């Protein structure tokens, strides 16, 4: 079944607003496109405003009757998250769903630290936790929260004592960060949330640009693998 035939079987999103973090590329951009296709409006929360505005311009040329807003959002930066939450509460508290898609997978040759922890963990897990901690207590009404999980969550990994532990490989960092995201989902889904509902999605093997910072031969190998895998 083609993606459009599949989407045609789903309910319309007319008069509904969906917020997507990291909505300028990869899975996030695909989600934005499909929400617009189903008649919804979108708020793209993104770090790169220039790229976000380019995406907005292209999409509105196709979906002229839809509405797209942009909120500056760097999931590795505490102040950026808090500022973005304030904007959501003031301008977009009527949102139907929040898709927490933003995330990174660092190249081991360009490992960076933020607040004395690896950027992958800071962005993928700590940032999501801070977003929800600041947003949920101030929200009213019914809202859906969609966590972006991963097939690697829960894989056997190196034991750590703190999220600030060092000497972790890029893949170990990613496993820890995505295991943390899924732990957040299980935590919130067990609470009495007064109209809030929580969902966990795992995209499986998907062709995205999450490894865009890796050496060219790794990016090439990844594309070849996915092409072979999806040919069956």
What annotation goes with each model-predicted range?
Residues 61-79:
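Rossmann-fold cofactor-recognition segment
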Residues 108-109, 118, 144-195, 202-219:
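Catalytic loop of short-chain dehydrogenase/reductase
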Residues 38-54:
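Conserved glycine-rich Rossmann-like NAD(P)H-binding loop of the short-chain dehydrogenase/reductase
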Residues 101-108:
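Conserved NAD(P)H cofactor-binding loop of Rossmann-fold oxidoreductase domains
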Residues 220-232:
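C-terminal helical subdomain
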Residues 83-90, 108-109, 115-122:
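Active-site Tyr-X3-Lys motif and surrounding loop/helix of classical short-chain dehydrogenase/reductase
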Residues 17, 24-25:
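Conserved glycine-rich cofactor-binding loop
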Residues 125-126:
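Ankyrin-repeat alpha-helix packing hotspot
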């Amino acid at each position: 079944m083609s993606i459009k035939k599949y989407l045609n079987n789903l309910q319309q999103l007319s008069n509904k607003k969906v917020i997507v973090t990291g909505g300028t590329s990869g899975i996030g951009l695909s989600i934005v496109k499909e929400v617009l296709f189903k008649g919804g409006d979108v708020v793209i929360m993104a770090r790169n405003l220039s790229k976000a505005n380019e995406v907005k311009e292209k999409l509105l040329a196709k979906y002229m009757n839809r509405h797209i807003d942009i909120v500056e959002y760097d999931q590795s930066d505490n102040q950026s998250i808090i500022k973005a939450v304030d904007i959501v509460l003031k301008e977009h508290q009527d949102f139907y769903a929040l898709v927490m898609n933003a995330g990174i997978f660092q190249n081991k040759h360009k490992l960076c630290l933020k607040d004395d922890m690896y950027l992958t963990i800071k962005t993928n897990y700590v940032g999501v936790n801070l977003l929800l901690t600041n947003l949920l207590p101030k929200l009213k009404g019914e809202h859906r929260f969609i966590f972006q999980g991963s097939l690697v969550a829960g894989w056997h990994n190196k034991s750590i004592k703190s999220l600030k532990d060092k000497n972790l490989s890029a893949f170990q960092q990613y496993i820890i960060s995505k295991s943390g995201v899924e732990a957040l989902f299980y935590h919130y889904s067990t609470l009495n949330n007064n109209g809030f509902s929580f969902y966990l999605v795992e995209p499986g093997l998907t062709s995205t640009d999450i490894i865009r910072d890796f050496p060219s031969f790794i990016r090439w190998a990844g594309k070849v693998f996915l092409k072979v895998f999806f040919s069956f």
